[in-house]
A protein has these predicted regions:
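Cationic, low-complexity basic patches in intrinsically disordered or flexible, solvent-exposed regions
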Residues: 9, 16-18, 26, 40
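Extreme N-terminal basic, low-complexity initiation segments
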Residues: 2-9
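Bacterial N-terminal signal peptides
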Residues: 51-61
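Basic polycationic patches enriched in arginine
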Residues: 21-23, 47-48, 66
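Cell-envelope and extracellular/periplasmic
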Residues: 67-494
Length: 494
């Protein structure tokens, strides 16, 4: 590796560490064409003088760098900007410096504060399929190219969101065909911080087989479906970390905040349409099932403080797994996730039917996961009103003698059995709460549940254990969510 002139000047020559010596060859100079060389003795520079010199040099270097206008990495060439909303653009420069941002004819100017921070907001723009150029001018000029206007989504969570496209069912074919000039990918590296960071080490990339192969499979399939349906550019930001609980993703006010600080905060207030979230396995292992609703609400509320109250937030109900979940914890989390749908602007994709290996916590069928999340966005954000975007969810129950009749939301074109066999995974109980396996039959858009062992039923539950494989779905092929008809205040049982 090369040595800089300053480093070479003070290169260690084997002299005592209390002093650094400059050899005469560095002091040879020319006066009126005559070479003048001091006597061959060494000139000693004390460590204190050296450190003072280097500190001054470092301060000068940092000042020079800070004087230049700078942008966060999320604002760069090849990015996608969210259409139809005001567009924040921000960065850093010398204190008091005037900075102008121009995107085509869209222009705004701001002056930095005493800490060198600046921010402008450009007017909303329409998606037009054209590549745009942005200039950011202060004492220097930054030119960003190949900018598209379209839809921007963030994907976050733990390993099932992080899971690479190349390592999924159909991954080889998906990677081979992942050349989409109008889809752009931004992958945030895994790091934590004690306070909100200003930037991340990442870059926007045009979607092609190489970058897509190592990108989030769920987020890619979600974005690809949106792109196909809307025919507008799509920007996808993946910020996920395998094995992470929900708490580090939550703002420091309501959680530990380490991942939020380093992997979400630097992206804000970059304009987005919404977030998709796939997480919860670690919190089940931590026996947080019953408290997960409060954690989820805190996370959504915290992120919306910066991105806006109308930011959509769609999430995946985690899959059944035969692993180390304690009895009742997975159904408890499912109940908390279902309750989270009461938060405005949210929706849940159910995937109980996508498990090939009940021993694998990572279902490899990611295409339908992304597609089911996309159904929520297409219906709620893009007004595709003819889409059935969810499988059946429990609505109400009615006791009819020794039977209980269950009504559902999102029955779509009607209820059916996925495999053509009698409905499974239904249990029934009386007031004693002792559940037994039950017979269940479809009656129009309702299900009637009964058992010869329970003559005075009061409650039903469905898919209520960690290795369930229920077959109830709607005509559109979307599975019913596990549920219980009675809200228990404590232990949910198994």
């Amino acid at each position: 590796m090369g040595v800089s002139p300053v480093a070479q000047l003070f290169h260690d020559s084997g002299e005592p560490k209390s002093a650094l010596r400059i050899r005469p060859k560095y002091l040879t100079c020319s006066v009126s064409g005559v070479q003048v060389t001091p006597k061959p003795q060494m000139i000693i520079i004390t460590r204190r003088i050296l450190l003072t010199f280097l500190a001054a040099l470092s301060t000068l270097f940092i000042t020079i760098l800070r004087a230049d206008v700078q942008l966060p990495k999320v604002i760069d060439s090849h990015m996608v900007l969210q259409r139809d909303v005001p567009l924040p653009v921000w960065g850093w420069a010398e204190a008091g410096e005037e900075v102008t941002v121009k995107l085509d004819e869209n222009q705004a100017t701001a002056k930095t504060d005493d800490k060198g921070n600046w921010k402008v907001t450009l007017k909303p723009m329409k998606a037009d399929g054209k590549a745009h150029q942005m200039t950011v001018s202060g004492k220097n000029k930054i030119v960003l190219k190949d900018i598209l206007i379209g839809e921007v989504w963030v994907g976050s969570g733990q390993s099932n969101m992080e899971w690479r496209l190349s390592n999924t069912h159909g991954g080889k074919e998906a990677v081979a065909t992942a050349n989409h000039k109008e889809i752009r990918l931004f992958h945030v590296p895994k790091v934590q911080a004690k306070a909100p960071a200003k930037d991340v080490k990442a870059a926007w990339k045009v979607c092609a087989s190489g970058p897509a192969a190592v990108f989030s499979a769920v987020l890619y399939h979600f974005g690809n479906r949106i792109h196909k349906e809307l025919n507008v550019p799509i920007g996808l930001i993946n910020s996920s970390w395998g094995g992470s609980p929900i708490e580090p993703w939550t703002t420091a006010e309501s959680g530990s905040g380490g991942m939020y600080n380093a992997m979400i905060a630097p992206l804000q207030p970059f304009a987005i349409r919404g977030v998709i979230w796939y997480q919860g396995e670690t919190n089940v292992l931590r026996k947080n099932g019953l408290t997960y609703y409060d954690k989820m609400k805190a996370l959504i509320d915290g992120w919306r403080e910066s991105w806006g109250e109308d930011t959509s937030f769609y999430f995946v109900q985690i899959a059944p797994w035969a692993g180390r979940y304690q009895a009742g914890q997975l159904p408890a989390l499912w109940e908390a996730q279902s309750a989270s749908m009461k938060i405005p602007g949210t929706g849940m994709a159910v995937i109980t039917d996508l498990v090939d290996d009940i021993r694998d916590i990572h279902p490899r069928k990611k295409i339908p996961v992304g597609n089911r999340l996309a159904l929520w966005a297409l219906s709620k954000d893009y007004e595709k009103n003819d889409i059935v975007y969810s499988g059946p969810h429990y609505k109400s129950s009615k006791v009819e003698g020794n039977k209980i009749r269950i009504s559902f939301n999102f029955a779509g074109g009607g209820l059916k059995s996925r495999d053509g066999k009698p409905l499974n995974e239904f249990q029934i109980a009386g007031e004693d709460g002792k559940f037994v396996a039950a017979e269940a039959a479809i009656d129009r858009n309702e299900v009637v549940v009964q058992s010869k062992e329970v003559t005075a039923p009061s409650q039903v539950r469905f898919g209520w254990h960690k290795v369930c494989n229920p077959n109830l779905m709607n005509a559109e092929g979307l599975p019913a969510s596990p549920f219980q008809t009675k809200d228990w205040k404590g232990w949910t049982g198994d």
